[in-house]
Structure formats: C-alpha cells, structure tokens
Amino acid sequence: MNFSGFEFSSIVAFFLLILQLSTAAVLPADYAYGVADEMSALPDSGSLFAEQRPSKRAQTFVRFGKRAQTFVRFGKRGQTFVRFGRSAPFEQ
C-alpha cells in the first residue's frame, strides 16, 4: 500500500481524534486534577462562588383610585397585598 503524505497524516489525525474522544468518554471530568473529594469540591463559605439563594423580590406597583395605594405582588400567581396606604380616613 502506497500512502501519500496527505493520506498518511489524515489517517493519523483521524486515529488521534478517535483516541481523544474515547479517552474523554471514559475519564470523568472530576479526575482531571486528581481524585475528587466531596469537601474540596465545595467552595469556601466566603468565596464569590459560594451558593447564594436569590432574595425574594416583590413587584411593587401603585394604583390610583380615591387615594393612592402601593401594592406589593409576591409569588407566581401574583397574590397582591397592600403594603402602604391608608384604609381609614385621617383623624382630626
């Protein structure tokens, strides 16, 4: 079998690609830098990468009727609560 330089390099590149893909499928990513450890995999508590839960934010809107009231909306279904506003007239 006579191989030209281009054919031979193509065959070698193909086998190297197959070898690399099969090695990546066999070795998990955790072992790329040594043996994975449960505690060392977790970030430090003061780290920027520590898990932070998003704060529960409420959508605030104002409705203008007889008097302006500010409402706060929580949750997926949009439960509405009166946050600020007067339910009774001013005492004089």
UniProtKB/Swiss-Prot annotation:
<dbReference type="GO" id="GO:0007218">
    <property type="term" value="P:neuropeptide signaling pathway"/>
</dbReference>
<keyword id="KW-0964">Secreted</keyword>
<dbReference type="GO" id="GO:1903745">
    <property type="term" value="P:negative regulation of nematode pharyngeal pumping"/>
</dbReference>
<feature type="signal peptide">
    <location>
        <begin position="1"/>
        <end position="24"/>
    </location>
</feature>
<keyword id="KW-0027">Amidation</keyword>
<dbReference type="GO" id="GO:0045988">
    <property type="term" value="P:negative regulation of striated muscle contraction"/>
</dbReference>
<comment type="function">
    <text>FMRFamides and FMRFamide-like peptides are neuropeptides. AQTFVRF-amide inhibits the activity of dissected pharyngeal myogenic muscle system.</text>
</comment>
<keyword id="KW-0677">Repeat</keyword>
<protein>
    <recommendedName>
        <fullName>FMRFamide-like neuropeptides 16</fullName>
    </recommendedName>
</protein>
<feature type="propeptide">
    <location>
        <begin position="25"/>
        <end position="55"/>
    </location>
</feature>
<keyword id="KW-0165">Cleavage on pair of basic residues</keyword>
<feature type="modified residue" description="Phenylalanine amide">
    <location>
        <position position="64"/>
    </location>
</feature>
<feature type="modified residue" description="Phenylalanine amide">
    <location>
        <position position="74"/>
    </location>
</feature>
<keyword id="KW-0527">Neuropeptide</keyword>
<feature type="propeptide">
    <location>
        <begin position="87"/>
        <end position="92"/>
    </location>
</feature>
<comment type="similarity">
    <text>Belongs to the FARP (FMRFamide related peptide) family.</text>
</comment>
<feature type="modified residue" description="Phenylalanine amide">
    <location>
        <position position="84"/>
    </location>
</feature>
<keyword id="KW-0732">Signal</keyword>
<dbReference type="GO" id="GO:0005576">
    <property type="term" value="C:extracellular region"/>
</dbReference>
<dbReference type="GO" id="GO:0071244">
    <property type="term" value="P:cellular response to carbon dioxide"/>
</dbReference>
